[in-house]
Amino acid sequence: MNQSMDPKQEQRVWSRVMSAQAVRCTQEPEVCRRLEQKDIPVFDESAAMELYAAQCSAAMTYRCLAEMARGCARQALVRLAESRRCDGKRLSALYFVMTGLKACPERPKPPCVSCLNEALRQAYREERCTAELYSRYAANAGEYACTLEQLGENACKRAQELLNILQISL
């Protein structure tokens, strides 16, 4: 029994679907919203903890995306998750140097992903914004500037890798 919709009904359904997607697509990643502030951020203990928590969350996101992907895209996403985890460990070490305390952020919740390509797009944008944020932090970070610059370079490399994955999957 193959029932087809009349063209007007089909158009209404697609317009609802596309408008819902447009709302999701226009939401800026949290990191990008932080960049809207014009002042140069100061890298302190709270910034280190916040960045560490963001790295843990992104690593979880990449692991979840890897479960959805196939082939070389899956392998690349696993590498990206590992890269984020390693950068998180670096930030954890910086936090320990700054405070003498072990960084223990809340365990990140797995993301709700409905579309792999849209999630990759958001991850790409977040990596680009993360690279810019690290660059801004490095400008005022004193002894931690070199490490933050390296973390920013890592974010740029991850953004490029995400772009490569998108090229394959589209």
Tell where the protein language model's regions lie, with residue ranges.
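Non-heme di-metal
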Residues: N2-L170
